[in-house]
Amino acid sequence: MTKTKIMGILNVTPDSFSDGGKFNNVESAINRVKAMIDEGADIIDVGGVSMRPGHEMVSLEEEMNRVLPVVEAIVGFDVKISVDTFRSEVAEACLKLGVDMINDQWAGLYDHRMFQIVAKYDAEIILMHNGNGNRDEPVVEEMLTSLLAQAHQAKIAGIPSNKIWLDPGIGFAKTRNEEAEVMARLDELVATEYPVLLATSRKRFTKKMMGYDTTPVERDEVTAATTAYGIMKGVRAVRVHNVELNAKLAKGIDFLKENENARHNLS
């Protein structure tokens, strides 16, 4: 049975929109990682820069100081480690420590050395769709064009296709209506040769789905609905805050999909 990968979010920042300040010391971060592993996480995604709306950019030195001690403490755990960064210097420092994956929220567009660094360490990379929101073509077409172009550049740099993930970038450079369009057409991204990761957890899109004002934590069940929808559309991984809820749901959806496929093969 094909298992949907669960990526647990570990923000080691003071200002992330959902859990800023909770895990920005090594001891609390270690405890959170252990809990997420027990809850079913396949990947831990460590981020040292908040990308919430209105965030302030932190220096390279500050990002290093936030991320490296945590990565060094958890890299030996029995789980894949990803680092959420768009800076090749941070990526290389973490890859030297043994992380498995870089989650680049600018898909190599911010730092053109990123692909060479990831290829050098034979690691995986996630390319997330981003931008300034100004586009000359419909959102899905622009997303596909941009991500496939960057994936091609990643391959030229030496990263094999099976180590390149695509993320449609829900919550970034899109209106709520554009995000709904992207969700409805996820299968077009899945139809590419690359595995797809979906990251909707507690974002404003899930608030819109609720139809009324909510705190980020109150959006977990609706996040799980997007997980189920994404898996049915063919995504291979989901990036979430509430690992236990989404891991259980993904296990159930995976089973039902496998059962459906088996019945089709018999007919």
Swiss-Prot record:
This is Dihydropteroate synthase. GO terms for biological process: folic acid biosynthetic process; tetrahydrofolate biosynthetic process. Belongs to the DHPS family. Pathway: Cofactor biosynthesis; tetrahydrofolate biosynthesis; 7,8-dihydrofolate from 2-amino-4-hydroxy-6-hydroxymethyl-7,8-dihydropteridine diphosphate and 4-aminobenzoate: step 1/2. (7,8-dihydropterin-6-yl)methyl diphosphate binds at residues 84, 103, 167, 203, 239-241. PANTHER family: FOLATE SYNTHESIS PROTEINS, FOLIC ACID SYNTHESIS PROTEIN FOL1. InterPro entries: DHP_synth-like, DHP_synth_dom, Dihydropteroate_synth-like_sf, Pterin-binding_dom. Pfam families: Pterin_bind (PF00809). Its cofactor is Mg(2+).
